[in-house]
Amino acid sequence: MTLQLRDGVSVADTDYGMALLDEDSGQYWNLNPTAALALRTLLEGGTKAQAVQELTTQYAVDADTANRDVEDLVGELHAAGLVREAAAS
């Protein structure tokens, strides 16, 4: 499963990770560097497993923890209405 931002959501890299802006509501979310890496991987067409691999490669985190973090991130982004699953290509 890969993700895409829904229409009306902008993304910007920051010194501390990534910021997402919901242009419809004016709300924004700050993602820390690990969440930003995971989301970037998913937005670029990567799978959850690839996002986990990126996290375990670049940070001192085990696969189980990274997997939980990716699952939590995706769930929270879906709940906030910021992302949707990308159509299969």
Q: What does each model-found stretch correspond to?
A:
Residues 1-36, 40, 86:
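Acidic, low-complexity/disordered tracts enriched in E/D and polar residues
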Residues 27-89:
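Long, charge-rich, low-complexity alpha-helical segments
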